[in-house]
């Protein structure tokens, strides 16, 4: 049982390492202005591309640090969601961005499976059952 859990955690680290590495490379290219100006102009963004690159770097770094991986997962999801919206608004394919978003969440589940427990439906508490007049089951 413990060996399976370790393999899942290693798999999550590998997945997040690959995604974060790709984001660090792409974010660095944006921060240092290595993108051609014509490509940046085609995006039609009001923010300078360096700001987006800095956000991408921040998301990737937070995703890799164990203590901040939950925040990194949330921010990275927002980043890829924004990339999907940008491509949808330009009527461009967004399959790769969607795949990266899915991979980020799979890696998050593999690294910390208990983190998704807050998404489950909980039964009514004892006080809520008393408030609506339901019989208490002990």
Can you say where each PLM-predicted feature lies in the sequence?
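Membrane-interface extramembranous regions
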Residues: 1-138
């Amino acid at each position: 049982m413990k060996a399976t859990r370790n393999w899942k955690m290693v798999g999550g680290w590998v997945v997040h390492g690959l995604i974060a590495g790709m984001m660090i490379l792409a974010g660095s290219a944006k921060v240092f202005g290595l993108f051609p100006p014509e490509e940046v102009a085609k995006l039609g963004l009001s923010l300078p591309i360096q700001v987006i690159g800095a956000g991408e770097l921040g998301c990737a770094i937070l995703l890799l640090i164990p203590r901040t991986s939950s925040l990194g997962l949330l921010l990275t999801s927002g980043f890829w969601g924004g990339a999907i919206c940008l491509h949808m608004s330009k009527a461009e394919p967004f399959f790769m961005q969607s795949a990266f978003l899915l991979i980020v969440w799979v890696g998050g589940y593999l690294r910390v499976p208990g983190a998704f427990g807050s998404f489950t439906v909980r039964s009514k508490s004892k006080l809520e059952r008393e408030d609506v007049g339901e019989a208490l089951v002990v």
